[in-house]
């Protein structure tokens, strides 16, 4: 019983000590953020909605209507992009043992002639 208590106490102590575990989750407003470039820092409480990028640091999003228009235009063009072009007769997307058979069925593609 003592061994079980000591083991569980040690596990809880380790979880409390290391960052990114119970201690930080309990104090969520002080939760540290790990980044590759800057190490540990606490998120600032500004209302400007800064976006963190890995190269340039913090940026305020600009031209949001323009990006929304581009997104809407892309969504309008998506059916045209996805429309498949004409396929040659006998074309098969399959590979493996059936691929050579589908190539033989294409007229004009016989065995290689030297």
From Swiss-Prot:
Q: Does the keyword DNA repair apply?
A: no
- Bias (Basic residues) occurs at 35-45
Mark the residues carrying the PTM Arginine amide: 113
Q: Which domain of life is it from?
A: Eukaryota
* Gene Ontology biological process terms from the UniProt entry: defense response; vasodilation
Q: In which tissues is it expressed?
A: Expressed by the skin glands.
Q: Which InterPro entries match?
A: Bradykinin
| Residue numbers spanned by region Disordered | 35-114
Q: Which UniProt keywords apply?
A: Amidation, Amphibian defense peptide, Bradykinin receptor impairing toxin, G-protein coupled receptor impairing toxin, Repeat, Secreted, Signal, Toxin, Vasoactive, Vasodilator
Q: Name one GO molecular function term.
A: hormone activity
Q: Could you say which residues form the signal peptide?
A: 1-23
Q: Where is the composition biased (Basic and acidic residues)?
A: 65-80
Q: Give the protein's biological function.
A: Potent vasodilator. Binds B1 (BDKRB1) and B2 (BDKRB2) bradykinin receptors.
Family of the protein in this entry = Belongs to the bradykinin-related peptide family.
- Protein's UniProt name: Kininogen-2
- Organism the protein comes from: Bombina maxima
């Amino acid at each position: 019983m003592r061994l079980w208590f000591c083991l569980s106490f040690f596990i809880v102590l380790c979880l409390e000590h290391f960052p990114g575990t119970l201690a930080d989750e309990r104090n969520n407003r002080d939760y540290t953020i790990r980044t590759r470039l800057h190490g540990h820092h606490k998120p600032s409480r500004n209302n400007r909605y800064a976006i963190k990028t890995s190269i340039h640091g913090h940026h305020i999003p600009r031209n949001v209507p323009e990006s929304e228009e581009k997104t809407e235009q892309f969504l309008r063009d998506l059916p045209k992009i996805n429309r498949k072009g004409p396929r040659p007769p006998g074309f098969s997307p399959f590979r493996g043992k059936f691929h050579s058979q589908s190539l033989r069925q294409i007229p004009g593609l016989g065995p290689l002639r030297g």
